[in-house]
Amino acid sequence: MCGRISQYREATRYAQHLGLTDPFMLFDAVDRRPGYNLSPGTHPLAIFPGEALRAIHWGYCPDWARAQNLPQTINARAETAASTRYFKDLWHTGRVLVPADGWFEWRLEAAPPDQHSDADADEPPAAAAQPVRQPYYVRLKRDEPMYLAALSNVRGTEPQTEGMGLVIVTATADVGLIDVHDRRPLVFTPEAARRWLDPALAAPEIEHLARHACVPAARFMWYRVSPDVDRPLVDEARLIEALQ
């Protein structure tokens, strides 16, 4: 899945790298600051057809789902989004991109040994320590921006009301990409990302992008980072630095 991203570069850098010719910034640059630990409920930048960039709530719940008191969702599966009630309309009319510099994953690992134990060597060994949930940061080896496929029901400059927002599309993880679970964000190169934004793209082409255009695992690197990333209110550059 994708539940935490970094998006710390200037918006103009994402636009230039993507090859936008006339980007339209629909946000106040004065109020924007680098995001190293963006979680659902925050407002990452999204890129829309027409080259507009806008800060969008991460989380989505259509009106019919809200009426049934169903929870908002933050991800959509690439394999099923085109046919599920939550996302089938957005799949064709609400494709956007979330520019990112990396994302976080967690996996259970053995707890580090206690280097300061004063236990008597003659005492029986204590029970094995519980595994810890270790965060990892995943980024491109070339440390360039990446573009996450996303869906949104926000249009133009209309106000965002309850239930409106975006979801990040996930795909099956490659063999070799950090062995956490079987999902990862659907990450595009700039060329594939521009095609994803094309509102005239036919359904078979959308499906082809979702199934075959994901950046392969060999182009990524990942490493352990501070467990402070578990705290959504902590948003500092040190969170994407490798642990010694």
Model-flagged regions — what are they?
Residues 1-244:
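Short linear sequence motif anchored by a di-proline
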